[in-house]
Amino acid sequence: MDISLVAKMKKYDEFISCYNEGDEKKLSKGKSLLFYSLSNNDAESRYLITDFLLNKGAETNVINECGENLLHILLSRTNHNIKQTAELCQRLIKNGVDINQLDKKDRLPLQYVVNMKYTDEELEPLYQIWFTQNNVLVNHKNAWGKTPLEIAEKMPYRASLLERMKKYE
């Protein structure tokens, strides 16, 4: 099986058994292997495979055909271990991944944080990472005419996030 599919669909142990030195530098269908590992639906395997690839020096400043960076992909998953997701976000941002990257539908990675199915309290580690960055965009309209701030205002369980976002208006 192709290493990109293993990174996307399989558990960490199977990925390691299929991995060959240098795979972290190869592109599959024009995309970094990190795009595949970060889209793995198993949160534990997503973290372990991505951590392994980052430790191997995989390139992080990459954009896919939809204009998404690695933060868009990671944060668009539905199931998370928030501690691990926060660690990966921190590493990606430290490695230069842009928190304000707009995809082709003008969505910011922050919009995915707003939409996560977790409480403000559970998402606090992500909020801490996000709002210690400079120039956090909260008022950029997506293709549907909504900003992350407007989306958060409509959600009754985003009071803490909303308070932080209003400081960036």
Q: What are these model-derived regions, one by one?
A:
Residues 1-6, 95, 124-169:
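Ankyrin-repeat-protein effector appendages
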Residues 100-141:
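Conserved binding-pocket/active-site segment within a compact domain
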Residues 1-4, 26-40, 63-78, 102-114, ...:
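Ankyrin-repeat boundary/"N-cap" motif
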Residues 47, 63, 67-69, 75-93, ...:
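Eukaryotic tandem repeat interaction scaffolds
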Residues 9, 40-44, 77, 95, ...:
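Ankyrin-repeat positional consensus site
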Residues 14, 45-49, 84, 88, ...:
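Conserved ankyrin/ankyrin-like repeat signature
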Residues 27, 76, 88, 111, ...:
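A structural signal for the main folded, soluble domain(s) of proteins
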Residues 16-24, 49-59, 87-99, 127-138, ...:
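Ankyrin repeat domain, specifically the short helix-to-loop turn at the C-terminus of the second helix
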